[in-house]
Amino acid sequence: SYSAVKINPDHLGIDVTVYTKQLHGKSIRGQSSGVVATIDDCRFPTDGPEYTDITLYVNYSTSGTDNEVSSFEDGEILILEDTITYGNTTISSGETIASLISEDATSTSSIVSVGEGVFFIRGTFVNIQKSSIILDPYTNTSSYRVGLTILEEIVSAKDDKSLYDNAKGFSNFAAPGADRLKITATLSKKSLNDNDDKTFVELIRIDNGEIKVLKES
């Protein structure tokens, strides 16, 4: 699961989207709560209607100054624990970078991740890059089938010059090359009642936040 933190679009008169990319992997601290967290991801209302506000996805690492508060508080200001640069501007450690919205600013979301590896799909070994997908941005009671969406395409020598005849170690651009079937797999989600699996390989099934089916690659 991810901890979701909704922030206001502006801070000190600056549009926070101009530096949100630089915040990935950086630590932040709540000015009033003292809670410390690391930013793993950021999503925007432009990413889809499910995102109501600019949302930071964080992992909390330190509880508050009273050792009781474990998450940021509504409306509080966030302080940068690292240093970032965007354009010609530097925000140093100890400076403020954002403020939480005034109500219902924090929640727990659900996420599924897959590590880098090789899957055997349709008779072919397919390399899969490390990736994650947020199932629901503000709740951890999600219900989905999660797996890999498969894209098959024919790649010709015109698309990939490495497919031209390279006898004796030299590319012969006058000789036709062999076309190849390219399979790409992307982590994706489907509703539980969507059983159209022509281009989908299910890996895990989640119902109301609980794992019901887990398939090994």
Where are these regions (language model features)?
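Subunit-assembly interface segments of extracellular/virion macromolecular structures
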Residues: 1-217
